[in-house]
Amino acid sequence: MVNYPNGRSQSYSAVPKKQKTLTELSVAKKSAPKSKSLVAFGKRGMNFEAEINATNDYYLSRGLAVIHKKPTPIQIVKVDYPQRSRAKITEAYFRQASTTDYSGVYKGHYVDFEAKETHQKTVFPLKNFHEHQIVHMSNVLAQRGIAFVLLHFADLEETYLLPSSYLITFYYEKNGLKSIPLAYIRENGYKIETNHIPRIPYLEIVNKLCEVQ
């Protein structure tokens, strides 16, 4: 059993279901209501994270970059040992990530970035970022790495790459503001025009960041 962040747990039954006959399957297929297609990002059926993962897979397959999503750390709470040589995790929880979502290498440069999404139309809430992530990105920049955030405005269907230096500056000089204005992101960031393949061509902008280092 694994406890997910929303507190729900998932278990699976090992008892096989009764096989249906061909006639039963045919009748069920005809009577089943047609389901609506899932649309979560840009009306293409993918959410923001899936778009980024697909883009990274494309870059890897073309030998352009090696960038992966960092696994979410898990806190193991209970382990059973049904046999001496075999351990079974029976209870575990997802822990809060300590750094950012993605990291890798591009043209000899270390790349590190966070990806966030909002349904707000004029601002991006700062509550989406934790101070330890801001500190981590500051440390990456101090080592001459490439650090940034990908910000997706779902309702506007707009995606921006904001260099971490601008996020860090705003985070510590926000003057009581709880959100980053979209105008600030547009002024200091780069709008990403989504494609079919790759989905989110952010390396085109990373090239520019490499040039100014």
UniProtKB/Swiss-Prot annotation:
Relay the cofactor remark from the entry. Answer: Binds 1 Mg(2+) ion per subunit.
Instruction: List, alphabetically, the HAMAP family matched.
Output: RecU
Q: What does this protein do?
A: Endonuclease that resolves Holliday junction intermediates in genetic recombination. Cleaves mobile four-strand junctions by introducing symmetrical nicks in paired strands. Promotes annealing of linear ssDNA with homologous dsDNA. Required for DNA repair, homologous recombination and chromosome segregation.
Q: Which InterPro entries match?
A: Resolv_RecU, Restrct_endonuc-II-like, tRNA_endonuc-like_dom_sf
GO biological processes: chromosome segregation; DNA recombination; DNA repair
Q: Does the keyword Flavoprotein apply?
A: no
Q: Which NCBIfam families match?
A: PRK02234.1-1, PRK02234.1-5, recU
The reaction(s) annotated as catalysed by this protein in its Swiss-Prot or TrEMBL entry are: Endonucleolytic cleavage at a junction such as a reciprocal single-stranded crossover between two homologous DNA duplexes (Holliday junction)
UniProt: Mg(2+) binding residues = 99, 101, 114, 133
Family membership noted in the UniProt record: Belongs to the RecU family.
Give the site residues for Transition state stabilizer. 116
Entry keywords, A to Z: Cytoplasm, DNA damage, DNA recombination, DNA repair, Endonuclease, Hydrolase, Magnesium, Metal-binding, Nuclease
Query: Which leading EC class covers this enzyme?
Result: hydrolase
UniProt EC number: 3.1.21.10
Protein name per Swiss-Prot or TrEMBL: Holliday junction resolvase RecU
Q: Where in the cell is it found?
A: Cytoplasm
Give me the gene this protein comes from.
Answer: recU
GO MF, one example: endonuclease activity
Q: What is its main location?
A: cytoplasm
Source species, domain of life: Bacteria
- Short name of one Pfam family for this protein? RecU
- Cofactor(s) this protein cannot do without: Mg(2+)
